[in-house]
UniProtKB/Swiss-Prot annotation:
The lineage of its organism: Bacteria, Pseudomonadati, Pseudomonadota, Gammaproteobacteria, Enterobacterales. Involved in the biosynthesis of branched-chain amino acids (BCAA). Catalyzes an alkyl-migration followed by a ketol-acid reduction of (S)-2-acetolactate (S2AL) to yield (R)-2,3-dihydroxy-isovalerate. In the isomerase reaction, S2AL is rearranged via a Mg-dependent methyl migration to produce 3-hydroxy-3-methyl-2-ketobutyrate (HMKB). In the reductase reaction, this 2-ketoacid undergoes a metal-dependent reduction by NADPH to yield (R)-2,3-dihydroxy-isovalerate. GO terms for biological process: isoleucine biosynthetic process; L-valine biosynthetic process. Its EC number is 1.1.1.86. Binds 2 magnesium ions per subunit. Substrate binds at residue 414. Keywords: Amino-acid biosynthesis, Branched-chain amino acid biosynthesis, Magnesium, Metal-binding, NADP, Oxidoreductase, Repeat. GO terms for cellular component: cytosol. Pathway: Amino-acid biosynthesis; L-isoleucine biosynthesis; L-isoleucine from 2-oxobutanoate: step 2/4; Amino-acid biosynthesis; L-valine biosynthesis; L-valine from pyruvate: step 2/4. It comes from Buchnera aphidicola subsp. Schizaphis graminum (strain Sg). It catalyses: (2R)-2,3-dihydroxy-3-methylbutanoate + NADP(+) = (2S)-2-acetolactate + NADPH + H(+); (2R,3R)-2,3-dihydroxy-3-methylpentanoate + NADP(+) = (S)-2-ethyl-2-hydroxy-3-oxobutanoate + NADPH + H(+). This is Ketol-acid reductoisomerase (NADP(+)). Mg(2+) 1 binds at residues 216, 220. The keyword Magnesium applies.
Length: 491
C-alpha cells in the first residue's frame, strides 16, 4: 500500500514540508562513521558506479553485490564494476557482512531486490536508497532493526562523477525513514555518505523520504526532462520550417540547452535573461508568460497525480506489462527528426550566439522553471527543495543532451524519470506545438533587431524577474556553492 496515502493528513503535510538547508559545520566529522565499514552497493548502473567511484576516492571500502546470473553472464553491471577494479560478488557472499547496503538498482526492481536483501542483512545494519519511491509509493516495510536512510544527488549518476572530478559536487537531499531509525544514527550515516559523494560542497538539504519523492517526480517529469524533450523536438521542427540548415538547427538545440543553462548555476533566471539583448529580453519575457498560461493546467495535473499516487499506480501497471508504454515511447523518440539528424555542422557557434539565436529557448526555460517551482510550493513543498528540483538540476540534465541528444538523457536518468518524461512530453507536444510554430522567425535561429526600448517597461520586467520567489531562494542557496566550477560550453 502507498505509504504516503496511509498517513494521517497532518503527518502528510509535515512530511512533505520537511526541508532544512544544512550548515557547513554539520559535516565537520566528514565520513568518519563509515571509515573501515563494509559498504556494499547493489546495482552498478549510472548512479551505482559513479557514487561508488566518488566514495572510494573519499576513502571508503566499496564492493558490489550482483545477482549470480549477472556475474555468470558478465552483464553491463559486472563489466562496469570489474573494469573499475571493484570487488564483485553475489548477494549471499557480501550482504551478510555489510554494515551499509546501498540499493541503487532501478526503481522497478526494488520490491524483489529489497525482499532478498532483508533476508541476508545482519542485525542492526543500514539500508540506503538514492530515491524513496520503494518506501513511499510501494509502501515497502523494512525490518525494525535496520536503519533506513537516503542520499539523493539531484542529477544523473554521470554528473555526480563529473562534478566531483571538477572539485565540486551536486546538491543532495538526505533523509532518514521515520519508521526505521532504531539506534538514532541514521542522520550521521546519511551525512557521511553525502560527504563521500561530494554533495556537501554544493549544498545538502535534510528532507524526508516523502518530500524527496514527490518533488523529484514533479521536477523530472516537467522542467528537467519532459519539457526539455518536448522543446527540443518542437524547436528543431520550427527551425526546419523556417528554412534553417538542418545540421545547424540540430547543433543549436543539442548544445544550446547546455550553454544557456550554465548561466542558471551562477545567477539564476536573472543572469540567463541578462545575457539577452534588451529587445530579446522583453520578447522572451512576453513569450514566457504565454507559455506559462498554456502549460499551467498540465503542470498542475502532473502534480495532482503525483500527490494522489495515481501516476505511480499507472507506471507500476506498465512495469508489470513489460514496460510496453515506456518502450514504445522510447522507440518513437528515436524516430523523431531531431534524433535522426546526424550532426555535421562543423563551424563553431559562439557562446553568445546560443543566446542571441535562442530567445525562444530562454523563454521556454524561464516558463518551465517558474511553473514547476510555483506548482510545487503551492502543494506544500518548501522553496529550497523546489529550487533544487526545478532550477539547479536543469544544467546537469542539459549536459546529457549535449552528449548524445535525447537518447543520452533518457538512458542516464532513472526508469521513473524516463517514464514520466515521456508521459509529460506526449501531452505537452500537441499543446505547445501550434503556439511555437506561430511565432515569428527571429525568436529562434536569428537575432532580434535592435529596436527602441521603453525604459519603464524594461525596468518593470527586470523587477519581476529578480523578485520571483525562486530567484530569492536561489540567491541564498548559491552563496553556499563557493566551489562551483564552470563547464566547457559553446561548441
Amino acid at each position: 500500500m502507498n505509504y504516503f496515502n496511509k498517513l494521517c493528513f497532518r503527518k502528510r503535510i509535515n512530511e512533505i514540508k520537511k526541508c532544512r538547508f544544512m550548515k557547513e559545520n554539520e559535516f565537520k566529522n566528514e565520513n568518519k562513521i563509515l571509515k573501515n565499514k563494509k559498504i556494499v552497493i547493489v546495482g552498478c548502473g549510472s548512479q551505482g558506479l559513479n557514487q561508488a567511484l566518488n566514495m572510494r576516492d573519499s576513502g571508503l571500502n566499496i564492493s558490489f553485490a550482483l545477482k549470480k546470473n549477472s556475474i555468470l553472464r558478465k552483464n553491463s553491471s559486472w563489466l562496469n564494476a570489474t573494469k573499475n577494479n571493484f570487488e564483485v560478488n553475489d548477494y549471499e557472499s557480501l550482504i551478510p557482512n555489510a554494515d551499509l547496503v546501498i540499493n541503487l538498482t532501478p526503481d522497478k526492481q526494488h520490491e524483489n531486490v529489497v525482499k532478498e536483501l532483508q533476508k541476508l542483512m545482519k542485525k542492526n545494519s543500514c539500508l540506503g536508497y538514492s530515491h524513496g519511491f520503494n518506501i513511499v509509493e510501494c509502501g515497502e516495510i523494512i525490518r525494525k532493526d535496520i536503519t533506513v536512510v537516503m542520499v539523493a544527488p539531484k542529477c544523473p549518476g554521470t554528473e555526480v562523477r563529473e562534478e566531483f572530478k571538477r572539485g565540486f559536487g551536486v546538491p543532495t537531499l538526505i533523509a532518514v525513514h521515520t519508521e526505521n531509525d532504531p539506534k538514532k544514527i541514521g542522520l550521521e550515516i546519511a551525512k557521511a555518505w553525502a560527504f563521500s559523494t561530494g554533495g556537501h560542497r554544493a549544498g545538502v538539504l535534510e528532507s524526508s523520504f516523502i518530500a524527496e519523492v514527490k518533488s523529484d517526480l514533479m521536477g523530472e517529469q516537467t522542467i528537467l526532462c519532459g519539457l526539455l524533450q518536448t522543446a527540443s523536438l518542437i524547436c528543431y521542427e520550427k527551425l526546419i520550417k523556417d528554412k534553417h540548415n538542418p545540421s545547424y538547427a540540430a547543433k543549436l538545440i543539442q548544445y544550446g540547452w547546455e550553454t544557456i543553462t550554465e548561466s542558471l548555476k551562477h545567477g539564476g533566471i536573472t543572469l540567463m535573461m541578462d545575457r539577452l539583448s534588451n529587445p530579446s529580453k522583453i520578447k522572451a519575457f512576453k513569450i514566457s508568460k504565454k507559455i506559462k498560461k498554456i502549460l499551467s493546467p498540465l503542470f498542475k495535473k502532473h502534480m495532482d497525480d503525483i500527490i494522489s499516487g495515481s501516476f505511480s499506480k499507472e507506471m507500476m501497471i506498465d512495469w508489470h506489462n513489460n514496460d510496453k508504454k515506456l518502450l514504445n515511447w522510447r522507440e518513437d523518440t528515436k524516430k523523431t527528426p531531431f534524433e535522426k539528424n546526424i550532426l555535421s555542422y562543423s563551424e563553431k557557434i559562439s557562446e553568445q550566439e546560443y543566446y542571441d539565436h535562442g530567445t525562444l529557448m530562454v523563454s521556454i526555460l524561464k516558463s518551465g522553471i517558474e511553473l514547476a517551482f510555483e506548482t510545487m510550493i503551492n502543494t506544500g513543498i518548501i522553496n529550497e527543495s523546489a529550487y533544487y528540483e526545478s532550477l539547479h538540476e536543469l544544467p546537469l540534465i542539459a549536459n546529457t543532451i549535449a552528449r548524445k541528444k535525447l537518447y543520452e538523457m533518457n538512458i542516464v536518468i532513472s526508469d521513473t524519470a524516463e517514464y514520466g518524461s515521456y508521459l509529460f512530453s506526449e501531452a505537452a507536444y500537441p499543446i505547445l506545438k501550434d503556439f511555437i510554430m506561430s511565432l515569428e522567425k527571429n525568436v529562434l535561429g536569428l537575432s532580434l533587431p535592435n529596436t527602441k526600448i521603453d525604459n519603464i517597461e524594461l525596468y518593470k520586467i527586470n523587477e519581476e524577474i529578480r523578485n520571483h520567489p525562486i530567484e530569492i531562494v536561489g540567491k541564498k542557496l548559491r552563496k553556499h556553492m563557493k566551489e562551483m566550477k564552470s563547464i566547457c560550453v559553446a561548441k
